[in-house]
Curated annotation (Swiss-Prot):
Leading EC class: ligase
Identification of the protein by name: Phenylalanine--tRNA ligase alpha subunit
Species: Mycobacterium tuberculosis (strain ATCC 25618 / H37Rv)
Keywords, sorted A to Z: Aminoacyl-tRNA synthetase, ATP-binding, Cytoplasm, Ligase, Magnesium, Metal-binding, Nucleotide-binding, Protein biosynthesis
Residues bound to Mg(2+): 259
Amino acid sequence: MLSPEALTTAVDAAQQAIALADTLDVLARVKTEHLGDRSPLALARQALAVLPKEQRAEAGKRVNAARNAAQRSYDERLATLRAERDAAVLVAEGIDVTLPSTRVPAGARHPIIMLAEHVADTFIAMGWELAEGPEVETEQFNFDALNFPADHPARGEQDTFYIAPEDSRQLLRTHTSPVQIRTLLARELPVYIISIGRTFRTDELDATHTPIFHQVEGLAVDRGLSMAHLRGTLDAFARAEFGPSARTRIRPHFFPFTEPSAEVDVWFANKIGGAAWVEWGGCGMVHPNVLRATGIDPDLYSGFAFGMGLERTLQFRNGIPDMRDMVEGDVRFSLPFGVGA
């Protein structure tokens, strides 16, 4: 088996069988027969062990050359058959571009975007304006101008994403409240604005929290505004989002940027048949220090503000048990909410 004639015969047989293989399955069987562990070429390699040491090197070169020749033939035939298979698939799955087009299914709009647009439409209809601000903020706008003390827990890295280097005093905004400051510095009074956007906090993603969430925040600054105006605005907002039977109530609370401050609860009949009071967000009269930080005399003007999370609003309004469904991008979650294929 180690003679040049025997090796040539084995290679010729392998190459002939390889050339005749007309499918990948047939070629696989040919490989097993002529290049596998029990093939003539494999047996020739095993026979090297019994040769005298002085003959083994030369014989080994002949065996390797023979196997390499057969392997090259196999590789070339494999590439050819794969190319033929792929070409056949392209022909079978080809599209005649001259045919009339078919309807392309529309994607599903994300329910958070739909809710944000509905909130915006609600306040625009009330005569309010939309305002925007950057997602990368400074401590000045995110904390200082909003009356946060220097030692407030919200400033800690366990709650806030800070941006390197440390002395840049930049961070990912933790709420949309910085838009209030930017708006009051840039616009003439009175101001009635609504701000909707992404905010960032170092929360773990779980059934009720997400590190990136959307917040809607309202701000009104004018002469003579009171808690009564705030309550009326909240009631109108609640009815727009939860139906005409929705009601709100407020409970005393503390926020650095409002005084007095309150938390807002909403009562409504949800989409799964229940009705209850649910904590919705925060609100209050704009703190005099916030007005002073933007050059407004708190003896002449007053204001109110409120903020709610859109994910939380959508979750309890629609009976969604797990907030993670909102961020996983599964179209099956979005389709039931409206526009989609």
